């Protein structure tokens, strides 16, 4: 009886690990692209039913490469984990924060407002909160081989592309693509900015 119970417990644990690998980013523990697409589809369907706007925001760190080049990927990973933590603390439990890979993050907001202008204002307020939080200094502990642990201060801003969605014919991939394009517009304008997409979603 004890052996059977242990086998079942181990099987449940194994299944949970497989599920986590399939749907979550191993570094930040955030939903990955696969789970993001599912959550976005759900948010889009809910928006269509309720008549309330939703929003998707695409974040890209502006000066992440310099940290990786100077201190290595392990230190870059520390920054990414802290970025995930900061974004999570700016959103509601019903919202989804995901990591697409590299230094790219996405947030899906649902149930904003029936009015487009009010929804854009709500989304802008949260986006600005996240932008400001991500721009605060990062204190990262590093230890190179054979040397004592030290703490470095790194400054990192973000470029943010946003798109509102409601009753529409666009796919989840279209929504992500439009937000991505808006993010590049923000980056080309100097970074540390929020840019809304003009695409109709």
Which stretches of residues belong to each language-model region?
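Catalytic core regions of nucleotide second-messenger enzymes
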Residues: 99, 117-119, 123, 134-158
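Sensory coupling linkers of modular signal transduction proteins
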Residues: 7-20
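Cyclic nucleotide signaling catalytic output domains
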Residues: 97, 143-153, 159-189, 195-201
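PAS-family sensory domains
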Residues: 1-7
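Conserved long alpha-helical elements within nucleotide-processing catalytic cores of c-di-GMP signaling
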Residues: 19-23, 29-55, 62-92, 98-102, ...
């Amino acid at each position: 009886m004890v052996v059977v119970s242990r086998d079942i417990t181990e099987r449940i644990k194994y299944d949970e690990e497989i599920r986590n690998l399939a749907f979550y980013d191993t570094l930040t523990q955030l939903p990955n692209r696969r789970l993001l697409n599912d959550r976005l589809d759900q948010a889009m369907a809910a928006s269509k039913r309720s008549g309330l706007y939703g929003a998707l925001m695409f974040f890209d760190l502006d000066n992440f490469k310099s940290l990786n080049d100077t201190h290595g990927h392990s230190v870059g990973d520390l920054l990414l984990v802290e970025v995930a933590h900061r974004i999570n603390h700016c959103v509601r439990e019903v919202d989804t924060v995901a990591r697409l890979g590299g230094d790219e993050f996405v947030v899906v907001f649902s149930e904003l407002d029936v009015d487009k202008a009010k929804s854009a204002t709500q989304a802008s307020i949260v986006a600005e909160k996240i932008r400001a939080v991500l721009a605060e200094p990062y204190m990262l502990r590093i230890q190179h081989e054979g040397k004592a642990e030290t703490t470095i201060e790194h400054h990192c801003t973000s470029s943010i592309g946003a798109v509102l969605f409601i009753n529409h014919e666009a796919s989840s991939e279209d929504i992500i693509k439009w937000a991505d394009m808006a993010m590049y517009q923000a980056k080309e304008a100097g970074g540390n900015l929020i840019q809304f997409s003009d695409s109709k979603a």
